[in-house]
Amino acid sequence: MALHDENVVWHSHPVTVQQREQHHGHRGVVLWFTGLSGSGKSTVAGALEEALHKLGVSTYLLDGDNVRHGLCSDLGFSDADRKENIRRVGEVANLMVEAGLVVLTAFISPHRAERQMVRERVGEGRFIEVFVDTPLAICEARDPKGLYKKARAGELRNFTGIDSVYEAPESAEINLNGEQLVTNLVQQLLDLLRQNDIIRS
């Protein structure tokens, strides 16, 4: 569909974002986890979702591998496909924020421009960039999926950190040391959410 198609009209919802947030008892927001493969993005995001669920917070976790089984199953790993992957995820995340959810996304999302694109789509105050800062050597030593080994052997092309660039955030809302205990990282994130009045419990 062309963006300029005049036959496609936006319909406003009778229930507002603010009403949905009041119903949930917290604000809608995206926590955008970014970092190298093996940095701990999915692990920390999953642990945070579990902690938030126990607090009664309405959440949803969008994982990089999972969306490629459905929503983005037609995309590869070229720069163009990666950009489209992030665009689609950003649109879904934005819809979930408008539903009043705390959305956690775990994607390498290697380019600053794509992360900024999602930030602008979601809106300031509703986008929290979480940089899981783990050295490449540590990520490669972990190699939970065996992808670094394949990349080093030339069996996997365009792999971020090896033969494809990762642009680290320059001004993320929070930088997490990926070598710390997951429980410590989750606590840092809960503190941030409370400080920003996103959750109250």
From Swiss-Prot:
The keyword ATP-binding applies. One of its GO terms (biological process) is hydrogen sulfide biosynthetic process. It comes from the Bacteria. ATP binds at residues 35-42. Pathway: Sulfur metabolism; hydrogen sulfide biosynthesis; sulfite from sulfate: step 2/3. GO terms for molecular function: adenylylsulfate kinase activity; ATP binding. Keywords: ATP-binding, Kinase, Nucleotide-binding, Phosphoprotein, Transferase. CDD domains: APSK. The keyword rRNA processing does not apply. Disulfide bonds: none annotated. The active site is at residue 109. Its EC number is 2.7.1.25. Gene3D superfamilies: P-loop containing nucleotide triphosphate hydrolases. It catalyses: adenosine 5'-phosphosulfate + ATP = 3'-phosphoadenylyl sulfate + ADP + H(+). Belongs to the APS kinase family. Catalyzes the synthesis of activated sulfate. NCBIfam families: apsK, PRK03846.1. This is Adenylyl-sulfate kinase. It comes from Escherichia fergusonii (strain ATCC 35469 / DSM 13698 / CCUG 18766 / IAM 14443 / JCM 21226 / LMG 7866 / NBRC 102419 / NCTC 12128 / CDC 0568-73). The lineage of its organism: Bacteria, Pseudomonadati, Pseudomonadota, Gammaproteobacteria, Enterobacterales. The gene is cysC.
